[in-house]
Amino acid sequence: MAKKEVKKIVLAYSGGLDTSIILKWLKNEYGCEVVTFSADLGQGDELEPVREKAFKTGADKVYIDDLREEFVRDFVFPMFRANAIYEGSYLLGTSIARPLIAKRQMEIAQIEGCDAVSHGATGKGNDQVRFELAYYHFNPGITVVAPWREWKLNSRQALINYAKRNDIPIPITKKRPWSSDRNLLHISFEGGILEDTWLEPPENMFVLTKPPEKAPNKPQYVEIEFEKGNAVAVDGVRMSPAELLAHLNTIGGEHGIGRVDLLENRSVGMKSRGVYETPGGTILREAHMAVEQITMDREVMHLRDSLIPRYAEMIYNGYWFSPEREMMQCMIDESQKTVNGVARLKLYKGHCRTVGRKSESDSLFNLDFATFEKDQVYNQADAEGFIKLNSLRLRIRSLMLANKNK
């Protein structure tokens, strides 16, 4: 669709430098109505000033929606039922937020009669893929305006100059030479000084967590209860999904839990450094795996575990709404029906360790079979036949090699 044909755009708007400039640029270049949408995913910032800034910068209408409960309940928790983790370290805090933002953006586009959507993701990053795959899931014919792939504002200074020319009220500072993105699950840092892969991230960068060496000298124990793979209570107190994750963030942050420094493989093909704080998510994943250990069948667990890398890649690469992810989610959720129980964790100076787990309804741990003491239910002599049968292929191969070498 040509610029002149676009009549109304809904923009995913944060109020930061990039999206404020994009808002003005859309008004100048497309000459159409622009509706902004800002999602409250637990950034910790007051979003009402964003409304005023959007109107001052040219927005015709502003949406600000509180999506915290939906974010944790319908996106974070399903992902955590799978124990998803990307490249062994990243708990996908940014990746899982984009599908929800795009979903609500497309709902607003339909409500407002918009014929185009826009976002502030750069042409080098993962987010452009995540947003646009979701857009096309909801409306295959939607027009996507991606300014970073159109304009010539290809440097930070060019953006600042554009902002000054257009009287966009944006504070410019060099005190924090990196970019960040925050929601209830995590906060991410990238760019700027972090592009030096040898440089240790400065301590003043971190927001959610204490440095482990300055965390309390006394460990804290926390008990997390699960029902069908979802956390429902902490230390016996039931909470909503968003309340629970926020509470774990506070506890984990106090003990320096959940810092990760990762050089990851982006979906567009390049490597990029990301530094993350995920205190509550780190605790939640450890607790979930502990309850699974006592409630989940071995072969079910091993099959599910073999699929975790693929499932995590789907989320990282923007395929949350794909049929393969939805199919896999059905299988994962089936495996979680027995994941009911409580995990007990010990938090101490950056470490989160399971020290106990129990399940009153679904425990597969049977002391009569597992004990190292004398028992009446397991005949240890039976192990001989089991071993001989399982070693048959190894013995045959050994005999074959011996005959071959004669």
UniProtKB/Swiss-Prot annotation:
Single GO term (MF): ATP binding
Cystine pairs? none
Q: What is its EC number?
A: 6.3.4.5
Instruction: State the UniProt keywords alphabetically.
Output: Amino-acid biosynthesis, Arginine biosynthesis, ATP-binding, Cytoplasm, Ligase, Nucleotide-binding
Identify the InterPro entries for this entry: Arginosuc_syn_C, Arginosuc_syn_N, Arginosuc_synth, Arginosuc_synth_CS, Arginosuc_synth_type_1_subfam, AS_cat/multimer_dom_body, Rossmann-like_a/b/a_fold
The parts of the chain that form a coiled coil are none
Q: What broad class of enzyme is this? A: ligase
Q: In which pathway does it act?
A: Amino-acid biosynthesis; L-arginine biosynthesis; L-arginine from L-ornithine and carbamoyl phosphate: step 2/3
Gene Ontology CC annotations of this record? cytoplasm
Q: Which reaction does it catalyse?
A: L-citrulline + L-aspartate + ATP = 2-(N(omega)-L-arginino)succinate + AMP + diphosphate + H(+)
Q: Subunit composition?
A: Homotetramer.
Q: What is this protein called?
A: Argininosuccinate synthase
What is the source species? Geobacter sp. (strain M21)
Instruction: Cite the source lineage.
Output: Bacteria, Pseudomonadati, Thermodesulfobacteriota, Desulfuromonadia, Geobacterales
Q: Which gene encodes it?
A: argG
